[in-house]
Amino acid sequence: MIAMEGGSGNISTKMALEDTILTPRFYTTDFAAMDRLNVDLVRREWDAVMAELRADHNRKHFVRTPEFDKDLNELPEALRAEFKDFLVSSLTAEFSGCVLYAEIKKRITNPDIRELFQFMSRDEARHAGFINEILKDHGIGVDLGFLTKTKKYTYFKPKFIFYATYLSEKIGYARYITIYRQMERHPERQFHPIFKWFERWCNDEFRHGEAFALLMRADPKLLSGYNKLWIKFFLLAVFATMHVRDHMRPAFYEALGMPPDEYDMRVFRITSEISRQVFPVMLDIDNPRFWEGLKRLREISEAIAEAKAQGGIMGTLKRAVLPLKAALTFGRLYMLPAKNNELPREIRLQPAW
């Protein structure tokens, strides 16, 4: 076992501290507005979700076994670097949720909402801690206390928190379950034991998403009028960010036996099917122009990275122009026709994928 790199200066912590359009962010919100939330319109289903969260089905699941003693240095260099990036990014996303949910719970008195965020912060802390223990075993743990104090926070109105975190939880479920099912079909590709934990792990993400779906369905105005435009924006932003990010890990997806486009289509399809429970609009992920636009965003992202490495006057000029091209491409993607969706009477779903 490698001695852990010291303090806030270790490489994993620096990776987690990065603030780019592609990295997980930390959020804060209007706590007084959160305190005024009312779930009476969805009370029956709300109580059922809360009963599941209260039961804490995964309280004994996140325990490492001797399998986790495997040295990451045994992996090929490119795969090791990309797997580490995957773990740090996942940890940052989980811990971001933990910090936000814990702060909401601390700052409000509404018993329904307070209990929800207590349970969700519990789960996210457990997930982040599990990943960090794996990193620590290999001397690359993230300093979570330093991260909490130093990471920049982005303010979002509650409705934007709902749109973004609902998608984050549900797409997290889709990502984990897709990898888990691939490992079921191809156990020879399981290069790390963490994947065996993904099935029950992703059920936590699914339950969290169910709670956010109910919060939105409890306030119908969040899902109507100009808010449909915001929903479309968040859908596109989350899908596009995921696509660009996944193509930055070719060795990781080659090891899984799933090309990034194939993986992304599966995740997008699951997420779209699930989001029918709450979103009145859906992206047309079967439109060839959608994938052409994602490819263009990916190429621009790669060009920005090359310009940064190039440096000098030309590199600086490119870094000024290329984000404008990315914004224009995103705008064109946003203008593609969306699909309308009639919301179902029964909101809750089961993780059946």
From Swiss-Prot:
InterPro entries: AcsF (IPR008434), Ferritin-like_SF (IPR009078), Rr_diiron-bd_dom (IPR003251). It holds the Pfam family Rubrerythrin. Its cofactor is Fe cation. It catalyses: Mg-protoporphyrin IX 13-monomethyl ester + 3 NADPH + 3 O2 + 2 H(+) = 3,8-divinyl protochlorophyllide a + 3 NADP(+) + 5 H2O. Keywords: Bacteriochlorophyll biosynthesis, Chlorophyll biosynthesis, Iron, Metal-binding, NADP, Oxidoreductase, Photosynthesis. GO terms for biological process: light-independent bacteriochlorophyll biosynthetic process; photosynthesis. The keyword Membrane does not apply. Belongs to the AcsF family. Catalyzes the formation of the isocyclic ring in chlorophyll biosynthesis. Mediates the cyclase reaction, which results in the formation of divinylprotochlorophyllide (Pchlide) characteristic of all chlorophylls from magnesium-protoporphyrin IX 13-monomethyl ester (MgPMME). This is Aerobic magnesium-protoporphyrin IX monomethyl ester [oxidative] cyclase. The lineage of its organism: Bacteria, Pseudomonadati, Pseudomonadota, Alphaproteobacteria, Hyphomicrobiales.
